[in-house]
Structures are given as structure tokens and as C-alpha cells.
Amino acid sequence: MADRILVHRLAVFARHGVLPEEERLGQRFYISLECRLDLAPAGRSDDVAATVSYADLAEIALDIATNRRFALIEALAEAIAETCLARFPRIETIAVRIDKPSAPIPAVLDYAAIEIVRGRSDSVATTETR
């Protein structure tokens, strides 16, 4: 599927990280989502009910990132991907990228980041029903 809905660099302040200082002080993270799904029905109908709202995607990412705490940004990304796949059946695959510009690394860098790609066959809900 070539069609995509993108949410790029949603800024959140949160307390994720392995170190106690990361939990205590918190830091900024940037979350990007790329959802692959068929956008033709929405394009033809001009009806938001025929697509996935990028506002809803951003709200899910923001809610999970600010109301839950994870030691690893990999776990944060998994939680976002699982929730989006469970909530929106139209999404075929989702890529979640977490940028951590203030990662506690003794080097000069723009950011550390992870990116995961998950699809329906990877989701926990699908696995449990097999």
C-alpha cells in the first residue's frame, strides 16, 4: 500500500528513560507516525469517516507518552503501535519513530532515535486470537 497518513515530530515532554534522573527531570521527545492504509475511499467520498484522523493518531501518541512511563523508548513505540492498530482497523501497517534529543550519551549528537514497523500480523490482538 502506497497511501500514508503522517504525523511528523509531535513534541512531548515526558519522563521516559533508564536513569533515575530521566524520570525525575523529564525531557522532550519527538514522536513520528507513518500509517499505511487505503486512502482512496476518503479521497473519493470526502468523508472523514472513511479514513483515520491524524488528530486521533496524535492524541493517542500524546496520551500514551505523557500518562505512562517507560524505561525504554522501544516500549513506548510498541504501546503506541499496538493501540493504533487495535483502535483503527483501516491501518495496515504503522511505523513509529521516537527521537530523544537529550539522550544521556557522552557525545555531541542531534538525537538518538528508534523506529519500529508493525502490521496486523504483529499485533498482540491478532496473535492472541490464533
Curated annotation (Swiss-Prot):
It catalyses: 7,8-dihydroneopterin = 6-hydroxymethyl-7,8-dihydropterin + glycolaldehyde. CDD domains: DHNA_DHNTPE. Pathway: Cofactor biosynthesis; tetrahydrofolate biosynthesis; 2-amino-4-hydroxy-6-hydroxymethyl-7,8-dihydropteridine diphosphate from 7,8-dihydroneopterin triphosphate: step 3/4. The keyword Lyase applies. Its EC number is 4.1.2.25. GO terms for biological process: folic acid biosynthetic process; tetrahydrofolate biosynthetic process. InterPro entries: Dihydroneopterin_aldolase (IPR006156), FolB_dom (IPR006157), GTP-CH-I_C/QueF (IPR043133). Belongs to the DHNA family. PANTHER family: DIHYDRONEOPTERIN ALDOLASE 1-RELATED. This is Dihydroneopterin aldolase. It comes from Methylorubrum extorquens (strain ATCC 14718 / DSM 1338 / JCM 2805 / NCIMB 9133 / AM1) (Methylobacterium extorquens).
